[in-house]
Every structure is written in structure tokens, then in C-alpha cells.
């Protein structure tokens, strides 16, 4: 399976608590819900497309508990996101959740110090996509291990100014190629991007030079 990461992100890279004031107040974060005033009808349609591609969903504990609280209440059979989360295969990374505490449809708890290897084995299984949603700490771990094949983002035209960022200091350098991009419906200016990894451990490097009076690269 391909491992894909799905994120709502601000202009300054913040991914913490986009959907509610108390969605993720960890670290004293008090700017939650920043996405909501900037959404318009049709703007989040790509999210349904994302979940429609999932063979399995992989979450960190905080995101798992937040999603379970909200999405287990959505019983609309036409809601693709709810169907994927409530009935599809899920994996949650946690050393504190019991099997009973992780009860939500088909959920398996990944425990232990070898989470990267457990995810690597899942990724090696046949199928379509193993999708990560939210799950800031897990995303960073998988990125640094070189396991993320695809990032799908919706970037909103807002600067949050604080909070957990998708990539902050110390992230392993990587290069991606944009394979899809479009301005989301509704006129708010949010941009949906799909990026496929082309290199891990380096961005590549070069410089601009002038040769024979012409600008060039080297």
C-alpha cells in the first residue's frame, strides 16, 4: 500500500486544532477552530475523495479519540468520511489505549517501541492506500523514517501564529513533486495540493549563475 498523509494547514504551516476551539488544546494552544471561518460550501469536497481511496486508516491516539467522538455520531449512509471511519479498518498508535478503550468498528492498536517497523510492514501489504489523517507526532515520525509516499493538503489563507506545524525545525530534508493542485470551490482562496515524494534525506541543491550574460543554474 502507499502511505498517504492528509492535512489541513495554515499559511504558516500550523495543523493543530483546525476544526474546533477545544479540538486540540495541548501545549496551551488557544487558537483552535481557525479553519472554520474560512470554509465555504463545496470547499472540503476533496476530503470525501481522500477517504474514498482509503484501504485502511492510521491515526495517533489524540486524533483517534477526537475523530471517534465526532464521527461515531454521523450515521448518514451517504457520508463517505463517516462510512470510512465507522466501518473501515483503522489502526491507532498508542501504548496507553487498551483494546476496550479503542473500541470503534474495526480498530487495531499498534503498541511498542517498533511502531515504525509495524507501519513499514503494513505499508508493504498489497492494496491501495494506508492513510494518515491529522496525527501530528505520528506524521513527523513517519516522515523522518522516509515512509510517506504522498502528502495531500488543503492550505487555508490564514496565519495562525502558534501551534504544531506540519514541518518544524529538525525535519528530515525531502523533495516532493506536485501532481495535483486546484483552488478549492467557494472562493475563500484555499488551495488543495497533492505532492508525491521524489527524494528523502536531501532536497538537492544548486545556484543561479550568469554565463555569457544570460541567467542560468549550476
Residues covered by each model-derived region:
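Enzymes that bind and transform nitrogen-containing heteroaromatic metabolites
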Residues: 1-218
Amino acid at each position: 500500500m502507499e502511505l498517504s498523509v492528509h492535512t489541513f494547514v495554515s499559511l504558516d504551516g500550523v495543523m493543530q486544532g483546525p476544526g474546533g476551539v477545544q479540538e486540540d488544546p495541548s501545549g496551551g494552544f488557544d487558537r483552535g477552530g481557525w479553519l472554520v471561518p474560512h470554509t465555504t460550501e463545496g470547499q472540503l469536497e476533496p476530503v470525501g475523495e481522500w477517504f474514498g481511496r482509503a484501504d485502511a486508516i492510521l491515526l495517533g491516539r489524540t486524533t483517534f479519540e477526537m475523530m471517534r467522538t465526532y464521527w461515531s455520531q454521523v450515521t448518514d449512509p451517504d457520508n463517505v468520511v463517516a462510512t470510512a471511519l465507522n466501518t473501515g479498518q483503522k489502526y491507532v498508535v498508542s501504548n496507553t489505549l487498551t483494546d476496550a478503550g479503542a473500541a470503534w468498528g474495526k480498530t487495531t492498536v499498534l503498541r511498542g517501541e517498533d511502531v515504525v517497523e509495524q507501519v513499514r510492514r503494513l505499508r508493504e501489504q498489497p492494496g491501495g492506500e494506508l492513510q494518515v489523517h491529522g496525527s501530528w507526532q505520528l506524521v513527523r515520525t513517519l516522515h523522518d523514517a522516509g515512509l510517506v509516499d504522498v502528502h495531500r493538503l488543503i492550505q487555508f489563507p490564514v496565519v495562525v501564529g502558534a501551534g504544531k506545524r506540519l514541518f518544524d525545525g529538525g525535519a528530515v530534508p525531502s523533495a516532493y513533486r506536485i501532481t495535483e493542485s486546484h483552488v478549492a470551490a467557494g472562493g475563500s482562496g484555499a488551495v488543495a495540493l497533492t505532492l508525491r515524494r521524489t527524494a528523502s534525506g536531501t532536497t538537492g541543491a544548486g545556484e543561479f549563475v550568469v554565463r555569457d550574460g544570460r541567467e542560468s543554474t549550476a
